[in-house]
Curated annotation (Swiss-Prot):
Underlying gene: accD
Record-linked Pfam families: Carboxyl_trans
Occurrences of domain CoA carboxyltransferase N-terminal (ranges): 29-298
Keywords assigned by UniProt, alphabetized: ATP-binding, Cytoplasm, Fatty acid biosynthesis, Fatty acid metabolism, Lipid biosynthesis, Lipid metabolism, Nucleotide-binding, Transferase
UniProt source species: Methylobacterium nodulans (strain LMG 21967 / CNCM I-2342 / ORS 2060)
E.C. no: 2.1.3.15
Family assignment from sequence similarity: Belongs to the AccD/PCCB family.
Pathway assigned to this chain's UniProt record: Lipid metabolism; malonyl-CoA biosynthesis; malonyl-CoA from acetyl-CoA: step 1/1
GO BP terms, alphabetized: fatty acid biosynthetic process; malonyl-CoA biosynthetic process
Protein name per its UniProtKB record: Acetyl-coenzyme A carboxylase carboxyl transferase subunit beta
Enzyme class, first EC level, given as a word: transferase
Reactions this protein catalyses: N(6)-carboxybiotinyl-L-lysyl-[protein] + acetyl-CoA = N(6)-biotinyl-L-lysyl-[protein] + malonyl-CoA
Amino acid sequence: MKVETMNWISEVVRPRIKTLFKRETPENLWVKCPETGQMVFHKEVEANDYVIPGSEHHLRMTAQQRLKMMFDQGTWLDVPLPEVPVDPLKFRDEKRYVDRLKDARAKTGMMDAFKVGFGRVGGLPMTLAVQDFGFMGGSLGMAAGEAFVRGAETALDKRTPYVLFAASGGARMQEGILSLMQMPRTTVAVRRLNQARLPYLVVMTNPTTGGVTASYAMLGDIHLAEPGALIGFAGPRVIEQTIREKLPDGFQRSEYLREHGMIDQVVHRRDLKATIARLCGLLMQAPAAEPAEEEAEPLPA
């Protein structure tokens, strides 16, 4: 009898007491800094545009968060994006591609890795395209290529600057050659912006790599980057394994690339909006009219 009583106390009463006094704590209440290990209350991080106070480490942002941060009053018009065939290659690795797409859409609430918005930034009409790394690593596929081109067409139609926030691991392997085709297609779209004399600015965020770096991310009139962003074609680990040498400290980080002339400026996230508005304002000014050549008067005989 005594044994049964003890079992009842240990198996039934104690767990109920623990549950009664247990305080529910959401898993995402605190954010850990990847650099210092510092724990920061999530509301502080959100209020600081997802930059860790103290270490100034720039966390990744969703496309929605990025657009809200950039546009005046946090309001903009979503640009409708074209629909593309889903999984035309019927690709499967460990998992079917269509299932990977379903999971990514459920996780992010997006149809693919790109969002395009039109609105005002610092009072200037502007078209912004944002890649979301949370959607299959921001990989470039048919949908992303179509979205980039539609953003460029919107900028052409409305005569606005086109600003891209790049965040990608590269081309989407599940779409094979159809993914690689987006590299020349996006390059042609950038060329059309150049011909129309409209500014195209690229902001490289962490990470910007692979086929995205080999195409539209490196074709801007001005290249900006967030602090500490990884930027390159192949990652540093792959390069080290290939050349069998240790890479320099900070190799492929935005500060290193700035020192070596690959990008124009490293800009803290809090200064991005003002910097982009200022640059676009300068670039959109019409060139001064050249003075008309006066017809030479005939010399007296």
